[in-house]
């Protein structure tokens, strides 16, 4: 489960980076690579709104996924600690001398 969520987390991070770099800035950034001011079928305002909404959605998914991963990781760590404590207690009980 953690492996799947980690893969999703990395995928969201890459998509988030791409969407942020595609957004228009003062110097047009990487968005100028796609053809500059070619308005074609879709207007620049529509593309800007889509990229803004995509950024918000991806950021929300990224944060939720990060919180879920952190919770699962802490539970897994506490399970491991409790198993180690159990093993140590069993070894301590077995190492005591037997009275005859």
From Swiss-Prot:
It is found in: Cell membrane. It is a multi-pass membrane protein. GO terms for biological process: intracellular protein transmembrane transport; protein secretion; protein transport by the Sec complex. The chain crosses the membrane at residues 1-21, 54-74. It holds the Pfam family SecG. Keywords: Cell membrane, Membrane, Protein transport, Translocation, Transmembrane, Transmembrane helix, Transport. One of its GO terms (molecular function) is protein-transporting ATPase activity. GO terms for cellular component: plasma membrane. It comes from the Bacteria. Involved in protein export. Participates in an early event of protein translocation. PANTHER family: PROTEIN-EXPORT MEMBRANE PROTEIN SECG. Belongs to the SecG family. This is Protein-export membrane protein SecG. The gene is secG.
């Amino acid at each position: 489960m953690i492996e799947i969520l980690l893969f999703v987390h990395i995928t969201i991070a890459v998509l988030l980076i791409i969407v942020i770099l595609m957004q228009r800035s003062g110097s047009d950034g990487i968005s100028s690579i796609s053809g500059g001011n070619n308005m074609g079928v879709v207007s620049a305002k529509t593309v800007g709104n889509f990229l803004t909404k995509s950024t918000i959605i991806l950021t929300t998914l990224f944060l939720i996924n990060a919180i879920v991963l952190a919770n699962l990781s802490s539970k897994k760590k506490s399970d491991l600690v409790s198993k180690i404590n159990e093993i140590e207690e069993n070894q301590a009980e077995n190492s005591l001398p037997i009275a005859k």
